A protein has these predicted regions:
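Extended glycan-interaction surfaces of carbohydrate-active proteins
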Residues: 1-27, 60-83, 99-102, 106, ...
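Generic preference for well-ordered secondary structure
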Residues: 19, 32, 85-86, 128
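Well-ordered alpha-helical segments within folded domains of soluble proteins
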Residues: 25-41, 89-103
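Active-site-proximal binding-pocket segments
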Residues: 25-32, 42-51, 59-66
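Beta-rich accessory regions
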Residues: 40-50, 61, 114, 119-173
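Catalytic cores of secreted or luminal carbohydrate-active enzymes
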Residues: 87-128
Length: 173
């Protein structure tokens, strides 16, 4: 289902596949972002980062703005994602996709009512340093800086325990 730019809505091997149809083979950035997050959540970080890198590449190739969808034509055949004729750009959930991807890179999982926040960043290849400032958390603003394996966090409220490992999918509080 991977086109080289993102996850298609239908695999190329399936009957009915049409890479330039709305729902039968196109790539929707928000679907890809959800898959990126799910793969990382269940420990498949390398797979997650492969999709994340492809989505970043698509965004760069499309001028820094992810559209609602683009065609599912294979990256091996085209140097940039092929647009979908009536795709909206900007489009709300496509515009939100990079935020989910950023949270996924940080593996940020706040559970404020229970007094815990998990943070275990993993930078994808090509990103050497990341700084995110002003993250709202329990009435405070948090800054996270990542460079390689070094992580520096400022602004965590005293009543929040910072857990510096990924939260296991089945973790109960």
């Amino acid at each position: 289902m991977f086109s080289g730019w993102g996850v298609r809505t239908l695999a190329a091997s399936m009957p009915g596949y049409n890479p330039i149809s709305y729902h039968c083979g196109s790539v929707w950035p928000h679907d890809t972002a959800i898959v990126v997050a799910g793969l990382a959540r269940y420990g498949l970080v390398e797979h997650s980062q492969r999709l994340l890198s492809a989505l970043i590449d698509a965004g760069v190739a499309l001028g820094g703005r992810l559209p609602e969808l683009f065609s599912g034509l294979d990256r091996a055949e085209f140097a940039c994602p092929v647009g979908y004729p009536t795709s909206c750009s900007p489009q709300a959930w496509a515009a939100a996709s990079p935020l989910l991807c950023l949270r996924t890179i940080m593996r940020l999982d706040p559970w404020v009512p229970y007094g815990k926040t998990w943070l275990a960043p993993t930078l994808p290849e090509g990103i050497k340093r990341l700084k995110v400032a002003g993250i709202p958390l329990a009435g405070s603003r948090v800054t996270v800086e990542v460079e390689g394996d070094d992580v520096h966090v400022e602004g965590i409220p005293d009543h929040i325990e910072l857990v510096t490992e990924p939260r296991h999918p089945a973790t109960a509080v």
